[in-house]
């Protein structure tokens, strides 16, 4: 090999290494840019009273338009409870019937009516929900409200352990998958991930920050140019950027709904295929809060 050929080969090798390095760094830069965009976006405060803050934003992250609504509350000032119905009913109607202040749609359910998950309401396991033996999937999580300590926790749980782990709490809802635990993304441990979890869809989640504040979060979707929705991994990243340490995914898609007694539906439910506040889907369970 001549000196010129040797130099050319070395330059090609160096160029290849540079290209590979750029390919590896670009996602990090994009992620950093998206986090800054989200945090510094023009958030609109919809409600800020009595230990509750409700805010929303429309921004461009993950190379798509996103519409995010976040309700944050102090668990010591509000009682978080589970609402459940044996027949399907809109989140707003169930919340109104329970005299709730705020509510978000809950966990997964069968369109025939019954919940597909473990539910404990006011200290009693709901007989219409799923039994612990019905599934062996891992990476389920429990969101649990303890009225004695006035606290809310999100913990991982093998489905068969749910009654034992929830024994000290009055209101418990199981859902899937657990997104964050101690600021660590938990998706790698999933043994079953439906295809729609990897696609962009409307999402609902419950989350907790390092101070113990609790949040109900909705991510709208299925509205081209206005709200594309997120994959599960994007949902995890968003939750981290918003400062949450623990987070649990709830039922999403057309079920995604966030409701306020004073403002009504504050996100854009997609079941009517329109970008408005009228597209609620009927569900079987919700999470709601009432001022103590």
What residue ranges belong to the model's regions?
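Short, conserved active-site entrance elements at the starts or edges of catalytic domains
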Residues: 168-193
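Active-site-proximal beta-strand/loop segments in catalytic clefts of secreted hydrolases
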Residues: 71, 103-108, 218-221, 250-253
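Bacterial N-terminal signal peptides
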Residues: 13-24
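Zymogen propeptides
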Residues: 30-146, 151-153
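Short acidic-glycine loop/turn motifs at beta-strand connectors
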Residues: 73-76, 144-151, 183, 208-212, ...
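Structural recognition of the beta-strand scaffold that forms the well-ordered cores
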Residues: 101-105, 144, 207, 215-217, ...
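Conserved, well-ordered active-site substructure
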Residues: 113-137, 191-208, 213-245, 255-292
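Bacterial N-terminal signal peptides that target proteins for export
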Residues: 2-15
């Amino acid at each position: 090999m001549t000196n010129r050929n040797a130099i050319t080969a070395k330059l090609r090798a160096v160029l290849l290494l540079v290209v590979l390095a750029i390919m590896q760094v670009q996602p990090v830069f994009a992620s950093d840019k998206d986090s800054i965009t989200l945090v510094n976006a023009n958030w609109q405060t919809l409600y800020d009273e009595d230990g509750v803050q409700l805010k929303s934003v429309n921004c461009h992250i993950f190379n798509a338009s996103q519409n995010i609504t976040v309700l944050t509350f102090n668990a010591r000032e509000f009682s978080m409870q589970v609402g459940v119905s044996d027949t399907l009913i809109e989140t707003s109607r169930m919340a109104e019937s329970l005299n709730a202040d705020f509510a978000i749609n809950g966990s997964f359910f069968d369109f025939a009516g019954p919940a597909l998950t473990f539910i404990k309401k006011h200290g009693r396991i709901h007989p219409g929900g799923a039994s612990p033996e019905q599934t062996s999937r891992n990476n389920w999580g429990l969101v649990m409200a303890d009225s004695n300590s006035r606290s809310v926790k999100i913990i991982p749980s093998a489905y068969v352990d749910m009654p034992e782990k929830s024994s000290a709490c009055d209101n418990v809802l199981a859902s899937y998958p657990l997104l964050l635990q101690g600021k660590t993304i938990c998706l790698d441990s999933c043994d079953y991930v439906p295809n729609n979890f990897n696609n962009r869809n409307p999402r609902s989640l419950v989350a907790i920050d390092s101070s113990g504040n609790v949040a109900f979060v909705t991510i709208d979707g299925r509205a081209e140019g206005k709200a594309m929705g997120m994959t599960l991994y994007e949902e995890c990243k968003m939750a981290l950027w918003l400062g949450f340490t623990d987070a649990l995914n709830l039922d999403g898609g057309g079920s995604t709904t966030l409701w306020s007694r004073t403002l009504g539906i504050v996100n854009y439910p997609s079941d009517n295929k329109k970008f408005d506040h009228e597209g609620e889907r009927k569900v079987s369970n919700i999470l709601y809060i009432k001022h103590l």
